[in-house]
Amino acid sequence: MFQTAWRQEPVTFEDVAVYFTQNEWASLDSVQRALYREVMLENYANVASLAFPFTTPVLVSQLEQGELPWGLDPWEPMGREALRGICPGDEARTEKEGLTPKDHVFKETESFRLMVGELPGNVSQHLDFGSSLEQPQGHWIIKTKSKRRHFTDTSARHHEAYAVKNGEKFEKLGKNISVSTQLTTNQTNPSGQISYECGQRGRYFIRMADFHRHQKCHTGEKSFECKECGKDFRYNSLLIRHQIIHTGKKPFKCKECGKGLSSDTALIQHQRIHTGEKPYECKECGKAFSSSSVFLQHQRFHTGEKLYECNECWKTFSCSSSFTVHQRMHTGEKPYECKECGKRLSSNTALTQHQRIHTGEKPFECKECGKAFNQKITLIQHQRVHTGEKPYERKVCGKTFSWCGRFILHQKLHTQKTPVQA
């Protein structure tokens, strides 16, 4: 029997990533976009768990922050080089097979769906089980028209794929597996292949786990919970990043000021403080923002949209993080603890601000007089001394104030009842 030598290659995120251009992304509906986000982030978490050192891909950062996951067109020279979405030799093969660039993209997308468990139109033409080859135990081959990859059981559990033979047997590298003993099925798709069908979208999946994962797109279920603070996440990759907060580790340092941050995404956003970059502009008022999440929150001020309502006091919030922190006022929960003095706080922001008392850090400096502060809100209030701005006005007497605290104190003087004379 023919022998073949196997070469081990580390799995990278690019091996399982699918990129869309702006036009292609616009053609997807909301459910397809949600499924794409879920699968990309889960695949990133799987690759990251292999412990190969690499920084977070731009695509993953975009998806985690709710940004639009398109940028450079992979069919332009600069985009192809930057995204590395095509393997060497694919361009020549595309021309040889008479495929247009977009045909190639959708062939890659279809092959990708197979790798994550979704059935494409015809499974058999996308897999090479190598029945004539003697293959090492525990290894899989996944072959598409554009690339062939070799994985081990340890490095590619999430790439498990099966092909259907005569509607009765599944084959995995030449080993027959009985449907009745290895896979419980509930539907037969239009091509006669046994699978799991989504009732809402009519999609078919090979594995039950992929079917249940897809259904979370419809229910919005969050299944990954932090054991430290109880916060839950839709994606495991977000949970992994969040857990760094509790460890206190800040491995990403800013070269400008030396500040340490817990993720490279946070570092990118922090660096915009130094560069002044604000890439997110509101079309309603023209205000620009350095963070996409803050930009999305700002837009809700124009629309009046408030997605989160407290069942205790019926107060509504446009931001989930503000809603979560607010709920802790009712429950008394304080999951964040200061390692210096043991004080517990209800939010990570409050913990960060509190820690500056111990470190003496004052990162917010007034450009007018050079005075520094440990909280941004204190800097904003101080700047009103220079600008003369007094945004808080008492309508009864017309008096104005630059600080909210002084305004509230003044209001109490008006509302205070005069003692009744005997």
From Swiss-Prot:
GO cellular component: nucleus
Source organism superkingdom: Eukaryota
CDD domains the record matches: KRAB_A-box
Family annotation (SUPFAM superfamilies): beta-beta-alpha zinc fingers (SSF57667), KRAB domain (Kruppel-associated box) (SSF109640)
Subcellular location: Nucleus
Location, primary (coarse class): nucleus
Chain positions of all zinc fingers (C2H2-type): 196-218, 224-246, 252-274, 280-302, 308-330, 336-358, 364-386, 392-414
Function: May be involved in transcriptional regulation.
Family: Belongs to the krueppel C2H2-type zinc-finger protein family.
Protein name listed in UniProt: Zinc finger protein 620
Species per Swiss-Prot/TrEMBL record: Pongo abelii (Sumatran orangutan)
